[in-house]
């Protein structure tokens, strides 16, 4: 396969991140990597750009999801029921909008966010859940993929699990050519936010920033020659960008440690200081990142936590 076999298609989104890039891969099966959000504007842009390379929606044989977020999966609804929908099994409850899972998500965040110190009411949890699905789809996977698998019709591409930004996140790596279809693992012009997710009922929550940093270290070891990302331009200076992302994360983690050196704080209090201008508007994203830095510090045994009533406080360990 050559680089001409991967065709970038720029699809508008209603989100602050801007356009999402989906990829048409002309292998033995005509494959779309991600789909875009479920909007009329996105559907029109996708169809027009496919037509420019003489492809119709009905020609697409399979869609492979890098992860479940609405800007990547929502437009599945415009495809016929006969198309193959392929992705990590963790996509399924999100893209199918499974009601039992959505109810569990609501209960989980109704409990978690107050524990982290967020002034919260039950209506906010419901609104958060609804907003996550606003531009998504109601589809199901036809095939689940996992680490090390290949995909029929995409010879030479391997599935690698890269959780962090989403627990469902995978990339496709073509080792022979060094190319990677990277989803939101690494973006040229913005950081890829690790997002808090509800675990399976009965499980403990994941630690998205810890997972994300592990995925970045793995990406560094793989050392692809080019990453085709889910937003922005293709990335060729992969190692330099990974180090830049780590530098920013280390600096922010150190900021959090210094705050906790001064006094014990809740995660929400830390969030207010880290993101004073945007925490109210982007509460979930900023709390996800704040919780991530606290998870990293706990993993490094730099901080510990304790309960006061129903709220968790964090403090630095004595050095």
Curated annotation (Swiss-Prot):
Coiled coil: none
Binding site for Zn(2+) 1: 67, 69, 165, 184
Cofactor: Zn(2+)
Cofactor binding annotation: Binds 2 Zn(2+) ions per subunit.
Matches recorded under Gene3D superfamilies: Ribonuclease Z/Hydroxyacylglutathione hydrolase-like, Winged helix-like DNA-binding domain superfamily/Winged helix DNA-binding domain
Domain of life according to the entry: Bacteria
EC number: 3.-.-.-
A family per Pfam: Lactamase_B
Keyword Transcription: no
One term of GO molecular function: hydrolase activity
Family statement: Belongs to the metallo-beta-lactamase superfamily.
Keywords assigned: Hydrolase, Metal-binding, Zinc
Keyword Protease appears in the UniProt entry: no
Enzyme class: hydrolase
Residues the record lists as binding Zn(2+) 2: 71-72, 184, 231
Protein name as catalogued: Probable metallo-hydrolase YqjP
């Amino acid at each position: 396969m050559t680089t001409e076999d991967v065709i970038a298609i720029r699809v508008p989104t209603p989100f602050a991140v801007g356009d999402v890039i989906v990829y048409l891969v002309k292998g033995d099966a005509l494959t779309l990597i991600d789909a875009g959000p479920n909007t009329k504007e996105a559907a029109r842009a996708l169809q027009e750009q496919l037509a420019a390379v003489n492809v119709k929606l009905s020609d697409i044989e399979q869609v492979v999801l890098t992860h479940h977020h609405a800007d990547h999966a929502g437009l599945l609804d415009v495809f016929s029921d006969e198309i193959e929908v392929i992705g990590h099994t963790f996509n399924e409850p999100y893209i199918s909008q499974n009601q039992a899972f959505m109810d569990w998500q609501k209960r989980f965040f109704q409990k978690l966010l107050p524990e982290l110190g967020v002034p919260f009411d039950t209506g906010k949890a419901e609104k958060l859940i609804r907003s996550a699905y606003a531009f998504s789809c109601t589809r199901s996977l036809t095939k689940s993929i996992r680490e090390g698998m290949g995909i029929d019709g995409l010879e030479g591409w391997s599935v690698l699990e890269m959780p962090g930004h989403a627990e469902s996140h995978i990339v496709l790596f073509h080792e022979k050519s060094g190319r990677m279809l990277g989803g939101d693992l690494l973006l040229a012009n913005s950081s890829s936010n690790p997002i808090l997710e509800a675990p399976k009922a009965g499980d403990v929550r994941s630690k998205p920033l810890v997972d994300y940093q592990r995925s970045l270290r793995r990406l560094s070891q793989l050392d692809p020659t080019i990453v085709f990302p889910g937003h922005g331009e293709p990335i060729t200076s992969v190692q330099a960008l990974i180090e830049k992302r780590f530098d920013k994360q280390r600096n922010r983690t150190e900021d959090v440690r210094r705050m906790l050196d001064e006094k014990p704080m809740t995660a929400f209090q830390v969030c207010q200081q880290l993101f004073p201008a945007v925490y109210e508007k982007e509460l979930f994203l900023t709390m996800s990142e704040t919780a991530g830095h606290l998870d990293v510090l706990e993993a490094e045994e730099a901080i510990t936590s304790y309960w006061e009533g129903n709220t968790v406080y964090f403090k630095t360990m004595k050095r």
